[in-house]
Amino acid sequence: MSTIHSCLDLIRSQIQQSANGRNVLLVAVSKFHPVETLMEAYNAGQRHFGENYMQEFLKKVELMPDDVQWHFIGSLQSSKCKKIASVKNLYSIETIDTEKKARLVNSAREALQLPLNVYIQVNTSGEENKGGVTPSKVLELCKQVQDMKYLRLKGLMTIGSISNSQLSDHNPDFQVLSDLRESLQNELGIPLQLSMGMSSDYLLAIKYGSDSVRVGSSIFGSRPTEKPSDVHISASK
């Protein structure tokens, strides 16, 4: 059994123990890692993978098996919405933060005649360098997304502050997103999922109600230092 396989087994067991019977999705964050590494996780049963950069993402889509369920979790630029959203086995885009980007994604999915799951990214920490819409504007954006025929409002996503992720027993960012979900579900009348928690804090995120955790280094080890355009990718379907 490979190290990656062992890590996945351990993480899945920890998730199951923390989830108290809920289904929590494990998304393997694979940015900068070569396809050979992703295939180790795939062969261990992993199907949901998260990528951050368009060019790297599109290359990996070509090389990985077609039953992979891709999550785009990087900063979403308007100029790249169409290419990213045109991937047929894209499971979700988790970083919608403006109506314009949502409409561009909706248009691309209309061309495919395939609806797409989307998450609204929320800036829960208030940091200027973090993407996402402010909590006070989330309801308006959710309503706009609901009106788009080829988008399925899946839930809310956040990338919390580094300092909060290092806390062992509480996390203000997770609390903000959890409270926001409750109020939005009452307002919109639909269930919403939470995508929050990474390698350093995914178990705590689950305690706050996360339905999807994005784990990278705990599965694959330290991330390579190359920029996405320099990553060597060599594998075949």
UniProtKB/Swiss-Prot annotation:
Principal subcellular localisation of the protein: cytoplasm
- Chain positions with N6-(pyridoxal phosphate)lysine modification: 31
Q: Name one GO cellular component term.
A: cytoplasm
- List the keywords (alphabetical): Cytoplasm, Nucleus, Pyridoxal phosphate
Q: Which family does it belong to?
A: Belongs to the pyridoxal phosphate-binding protein YggS/PROSC family.
Its taxonomic placement starts with: Eukaryota, Fungi, Dikarya, Ascomycota, Taphrinomycotina
Protein species of origin:
Schizosaccharomyces pombe (strain 972 / ATCC 24843)
A GO BP entry: vitamin B6 metabolic process
The protein's name: Pyridoxal phosphate homeostasis protein
